[in-house]
Amino acid sequence: MAIAPRGPGRTPEARVEWALKFRLLDLSKLSERARHRAWAMLVAWERGRPAEGPRPARDKVPEAQQALRQVIEALANGLPDVVWMPETTWSIWPARRRRPGARRGGRVTMTTDHTSPGGIPVTPEAIVVAFVNDLNAVEADRLRACPLKTNGTTCGAIFLAARRQIYCTARHAQAAAWLRYQPKRKEKRP
């Protein structure tokens, strides 16, 4: 997956889908530009506004990816996950007033005490909190792991279900239906 130039998306569902793809990304194969873009997207998702300044040498993108991977896999399999949040001071700024005739007003802005000139590292724990907030906004029970078992192994692909979707793809749903049908068919044979 290449890092999308526009970012994780504007809607919570788009950001959750982006996180599902980002957790599988091989960061060692990214170019410097793509790595910077990944850092900028994670900072924007974490803080609710675009990143300013240069990317630090230790950007914590791999740690954020690992934290996302752990929470996604735990929640999709129905398990709890623990996230330790380091002490950080957050400043919360009120939204700007709506201009006359504008449809939308400003957003509440949150800033942290990471104001070093070398750039802002990503806080993996805050990324997990942002992911969970977006997941709750799109109905958290939609995050699932595919239960199809073939030859004793479970598929386990993690996906965001649409409506009553149980399996990750239509092909897996057909395979599961066929597996349920086969024993009945064998019993009817004389």
Protein language model annotation of sequence segments:
Residues 1-160, 189-190:
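Short helix-coil boundary/hinge micro-motifs
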